């Protein structure tokens, strides 16, 4: 089934007909879950439609500055338009650049960095090169994404990611940062976790572990999912 070409939230609207990767639950979870307390500068890597950057803008105080990076030209232009049409056009800056190059060139450091990186390994070709690049782990590994984010991170900052469960567990073992929060995402009550929300820091401290169920056994959105996302979804 084709996804909608637009998506309306409580405080902003997303057009996505030019973007390979559409608005999805993963991005909404990350945008709502990421800890942005006391953050002044925020960065969303691989912003796509601009969804997470806009969610961070909605959640953060007016003085905060948000940057977003997107390589694909069509996605960049659409995210730029989505941002300009939002209430936070003066709060978000967007850059068309590869995240590795951006990490090398950018002189600024950020308090909070978010990323919803591509997660399917190369296999069956997608219908378009644009979607192929957006969806598959072709050009950079998840460790590359985390290393790029680390270069851009303030000393006391935090990086927040969402990944498939096994890839997330593997990344925790490979990276040189400390995992300080881990939330197992269970699509339906009684099932095994499919995703991991992860927070990384340079500072070592006890990892806060939790889990979140999206659908209960009656195929209804769980109370915890509604609570997390109620500031965004129109029907919550």
Curated annotation (Swiss-Prot):
Class of enzymatic activity (EC top level): transferase
Cellular-component GO terms for this entry: cytoplasm
GO molecular function, one term: tRNA (adenine-N6)-methyltransferase activity
Superkingdom classification of source: Bacteria
Similarity-based family: Belongs to the methyltransferase superfamily. tRNA (adenine-N(6)-)-methyltransferase family.
Job of this protein: Specifically methylates the adenine in position 37 of tRNA(1)(Val) (anticodon cmo5UAC).
Protein name: tRNA1(Val) (adenine(37)-N6)-methyltransferase
Source organism of this protein record: Histophilus somni (strain 2336)
């Amino acid at each position: 089934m084709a996804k909608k070409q637009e998506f309306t939230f409580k405080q902003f609207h997303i057009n996505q007909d030019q973007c390979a990767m559409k608005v999805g639950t993963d991005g909404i979870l990350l945008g709502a879950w990421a800890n942005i307390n006391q953050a002044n500068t925020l960065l969303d890597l691989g912003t796509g439609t601009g969804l997470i950057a806009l969610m961070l803008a909605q959640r953060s105080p007016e003085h905060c500055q948000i940057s977003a990076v997107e390589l694909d030209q069509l996605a960049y232009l659409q995210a730029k338009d989505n941002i300009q049409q939002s209430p936070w056009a003066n709060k978000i800056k967007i850059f068309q650049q590869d995240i590795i190059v951006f990490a090398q060139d950018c002189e600024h450091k950020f308090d909070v960095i978010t990323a919803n990186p591509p997660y399917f390994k190369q296999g069956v070709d997608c219908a378009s090169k644009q979607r192929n690049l957006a969806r598959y782990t072709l050009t950079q590994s998840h460790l590359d994404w985390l290393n790029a984010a680390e270069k851009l991170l303030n000393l006391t900052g935090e990086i927040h990611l969402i990944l498939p469960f096994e890839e997330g567990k593997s990344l925790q073992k490979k990276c040189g940062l400390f995992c300080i929060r881990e939330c197992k995402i269970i699509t339906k009550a009684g099932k095994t976790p499919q995703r991991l929300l992860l927070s990384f820091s340079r500072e070592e401290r006890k990892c806060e572990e939790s889990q979140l169920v999206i659908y209960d056994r009656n195929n209804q959105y769980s109370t915890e999912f509604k609570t997390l996302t109620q500031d965004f979804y129109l029907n919550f």
